[in-house]
Amino acid sequence: MGANNGKQYGSEGKGSSSVSSDVSSSTDHTPTKAQRNVATSEDSDLSMRTLSTPSPALICPPTLPGFQNGRGSSTSSSSITGETVAMVHSPPPTRLTHPLIRLASRPQKEQASIDRLPDHSMVQIFSFLPTNQLCRCARVCRRWYNLAWDPRLWRTIRLTGETINVDRALKVLTRRLCQDTPNVCLMLETVIVSGCRRLTDRGLYTIAQCCPELRRLEVSGCYNISNEAVFDVVSLCPNLEHLDVSGCSKVTCISLTREASIKLSPLHGKQISIRYLDMTDCFVLEDEGLHTIAAHCTQLTHLYLRRCVRLTDEGLRYLVIYCTSIKELSVSDCRFVSDFGLREIAKLESRLRYLSIAHCGRITDVGIRYVAKYCSKLRYLNARGCEGITDHGVEYLAKNCTKLKSLDIGKCPLVSDTGLESLALNCFNLKRLSLKSCESITGQGLQIVAANCFDLQMLNVQDCEVSVEALRFVKRHCKRCVIEHTNPAFF
């Protein structure tokens, strides 16, 4: 994606080049002038063209002899009627210093259907386009150029692609968007550059400097960014609420910069306004880093720490001390989290609605009892692969968390039909149930669930020894249920 502000982007010039060379590998997004130099090749560097909005070029039919006006624009504005055409004739065999030029009128072309739409409809259509496509639309004609840069379309920037020079694209874009408000881009609220591996600290620093109203930033999979860049963003964007740094392996902490902490900005105080934080696969994150994050991000409500393999129960203790408003928490695949960690999580009490502890092998019925006792409003629990959980833990969970809607206890070999019976008799609102690879489950347990949980929408019994009759029973009683199974006789 890209945008330009009317000048060439050479070295560190004040203007900006075609962003399309960075975003969509295309040419300048502003309608270009007809080339005056007849010796200029069509293969010249397209990314260095001027970005000013010209009047529609005079187009010569390619069949006319002596046509040497370079590349004529084939995308002249359809709103122009009775267009004048410059017809250049070859000079006669005499010594004439100038070619003879005569003007002729081209027959009026029928207006394209899309050009009949009013501006507000065009802006609405453009609002559904990704950023790089929007930049390409800006190249069609003058009207589209003006519409494509409507401020309402630039509340979000979304860049994708591993080969994009994201740092440069962000610099050019923010510069173009700052034309009406020098040095700041007040309309931009969301930046999504997930999977752009060429993003570095320089690109994030550009965002931090130019986007004070930023509310959402997603840089998942951008593994070249570091703590310092994240510090800049959270320090200079006081309204930031949503931050996704999943897969950013160099990020080990989130805090204010030293300068921001010293100045005690009235916008910040000492706190960061982030409510949603995803640090999945930040495998270098340790307890001390989580301590710092919790101390600065006290307003967190959604926190995802999947596969942060160095975290322990101590880190969860810090988290609960500072972040008392957490509603959703995932510590799945954190192998050092045990029942003691769940005891700390249980202190969130009825505020906790979503908990994922999948593949935390040290968790047993003891930890489940802590959560079930104090987190009575729990709606979602993923305990897949917690092999220490038995029917006793499931029974205690079912009796205390009666509003449970989604439960995953797959690969828990000690859970049997007894646990399913407790679920069926207490959790009538259950909609999703995964029992994948639960070796002790039989068709009898499934029938009890189906007879009581009529709203069941998804049932996973892959690699379970259940009969076709039991699966058909489930289908009859739970009409909307999608059954995932490995029984070839059932279809």
From Swiss-Prot:
Pfam families: F-box-like, LRR_6. Residues 27-55 have a biased composition (Polar residues). It comes from the Eukaryota. One of its GO terms (biological process) is G2/M transition of mitotic cell cycle. PROSITE patterns: FBOX. Residues 1-79 are annotated as: Disordered. GO terms for cellular component: centrosome; cytoplasm; SCF ubiquitin ligase complex. Residues 16-26 have a biased composition (Low complexity). It is found in: Cytoplasm, Cytoskeleton, Microtubule organizing center, Centrosome. The keyword Repeat applies. LRR repeats lie at residues 185-210, 211-236, 237-262, 271-296, 297-322, 323-348, 349-374, 375-400, 401-426, 427-452. SUPFAM superfamilies: F-box domain, RNI-like. Pathway: Protein modification; protein ubiquitination. Substrate recognition component of a SCF (SKP1-CUL1-F-box protein) E3 ubiquitin-protein ligase complex. During mitosis, it mediates the ubiquitination and subsequent proteasomal degradation of AURKA, causing mitotic arrest. It also regulates mitochondrial function by mediating the ubiquitination and proteasomal degradation of the apoptosis inhibitor BIRC5. Belongs to the FBXL7 family. Part of the SCF (SKP1-CUL1-F-box) E3 ubiquitin-protein ligase complex SCF(FBXL7) composed of CUL1, SKP1, RBX1 and FBXL7. Interacts with AURKA; interaction takes place during mitosis but not in interphase. Interacts with BIRC5; this interaction allows BIRC5 to be polyubiquitinated by the SCF(FBXL7) E3 ubiquitin-protein ligase complex. This is F-box/LRR-repeat protein 7. It comes from Mus musculus. The gene is Fbxl7.
